[in-house]
């Protein structure tokens, strides 16, 4: 049911923003996802009202982290549970054009769709996608850079600051760490740098960055694996 659920959410979002591209809609759904999972344990709360007892069903939740429940981290839960209501006003979106996908495919020598432009450089990690992942060699130090560009779809005059969530296995930095937008539709670029000392074989490490202006929280998951 995940596919029709996401398709319905995208159609719902399109009614509010008919001029948005498919990549903008996808970005809005991904970056506003809720990184909480409902508890499998169900508890009941009984309260006495007048002469009757009223039963309340209580569901608990906890953050989606790389724990023994979700030991594969972001690989297991991705961008989280989509929230179509929050996606209506995502604040920022990552837009990806057809030319960006062609460049990405050409960089990995896939050209069944036609002729690749000469001198194409880059790699899949350069695709302006709302998430970031990299395969690194095990037991070796590494540094990976992810260039990204976001578009302000909110009002003018907003300033976003980057917050990094990571663990001791990798270091994540964002430059610049502050983005100020003078107008709606304005674009700003930044680079996310992920580095580490050596990860054992078959290791998956999760992190994330969140751009926040105090109202909007634009979250992008990061995965490094060997």
Where are these regions (language model features)?
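Loop-rich non-cytosolic ectodomains and luminal regions
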Residues: 1-226
């Amino acid at each position: 049911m995940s596919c029709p659920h996401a398709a319905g959410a995208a159609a719902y979002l399109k009614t509010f923003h008919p001029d948005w591209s498919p990549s903008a809609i996808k970005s809005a759904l991904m970056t506003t996802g809720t990184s909480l999972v409902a508890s499998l344990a169900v508890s009941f709360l009984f309260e006495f009202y007048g002469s009757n007892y009223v039963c309340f069903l209580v569901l608990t939740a906890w953050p989606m982290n790389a724990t023994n429940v979700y030991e594969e981290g972001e690989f297991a839960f991705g961008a989280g549970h989509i929230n179509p209501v929050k996606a209506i006003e995502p604040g920022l979106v990552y837009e990806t054009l057809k030319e960006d996908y062609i460049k990405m495919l050409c960089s990995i020598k896939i050209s069944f769709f036609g002729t690749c432009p000469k001198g194409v450089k880059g790699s899949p990690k350069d695709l302006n996608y709302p998430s970031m992942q990299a395969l690194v060699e095990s037991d070796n130090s590494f540094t990976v850079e992810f260039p990204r560009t976001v578009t302000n779809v909110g009002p003018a005059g907003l300033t976003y600051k980057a917050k990094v969530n990571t663990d001791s296995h990798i270091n994540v930095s964002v430059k610049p760490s502050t983005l100020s937008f003078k107008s709606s539709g304005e674009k700003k670029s930044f680079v996310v740098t992920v580095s580490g000392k050596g990860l054992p074989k078959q290791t998956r490490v999760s992190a994330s960055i969140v751009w926040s202006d105090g109202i909007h929280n634009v979250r992008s998951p990061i995965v490094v694996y060997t």
